[in-house]
Amino acid sequence: MTTLLGPITRRFLSATQIARSLTRAEVPGEQLDAKRARLLYQSKKRGILENDILLGNFAEENLKKMSEPELKAYDKLINGEHMEWDLFYYLSNKKTPPEDVEKCSVYQKVKKFVDEKRVPRS
């Protein structure tokens, strides 16, 4: 039985390791263009449609203009310790973000972008 599960486990771990490398907050030695491309992809493929739209639209309009430190902060924001729904709730004023998030200049840019795109309710 263990010989049968060995290859399956190895394949699963390999897929997990690949997925983890695609979503971690920093990739050592990553070129700036590659970082922008990765962040654009990760902004559009969040796992929940709401964040796909909010972060994907922000990324399309802003990543090319962002400096390396801003890209690093954006990477940490979207791929860091915050759950997807929490990030959505912070951006949609449903929850107050933690102090470190609220003070982050990149979060403030994303928040401003989201607030400006918000459709007024009647």
Curated annotation (Swiss-Prot):
InterPro entries reported in the protein's UniProt record: SDH (IPR005631), SDH_sf (IPR036714), SDHAF2 (IPR028882)
Domain of life according to the entry: Eukaryota
Cellular component terms per the entry's GO annotation: mitochondrial matrix; mitochondrion
Protein's UniProt keywords contain Mitochondrion: yes
GO biological process: mitochondrial electron transport, succinate to ubiquinone; mitochondrial respiratory chain complex II assembly; tricarboxylic acid cycle
Gene3D superfamilies per UniProt: Flavinator of succinate dehydrogenase
The entry's keywords: Chaperone, Mitochondrion
Keyword presence, Cell membrane: no
Location relative to the cell: Mitochondrion matrix
Xref: HAMAP family: SDHAF2 (MF_03057)
Quaternary structure and partners: Interacts with the flavoprotein subunit within the SDH catalytic dimer.
Anything else known: This protein may be expected to contain an N-terminal transit peptide but none has been predicted.
Family: Belongs to the SDHAF2 family.
Function: Plays an essential role in the assembly of succinate dehydrogenase (SDH), an enzyme complex (also referred to as respiratory complex II) that is a component of both the tricarboxylic acid (TCA) cycle and the mitochondrial electron transport chain, and which couples the oxidation of succinate to fumarate with the reduction of ubiquinone (coenzyme Q) to ubiquinol. Required for flavinylation (covalent attachment of FAD) of the flavoprotein subunit of the SDH catalytic dimer.
UniProt-recorded name of the protein: Succinate dehydrogenase assembly factor 2, mitochondrial
Taxonomic source organism: Caenorhabditis briggsae
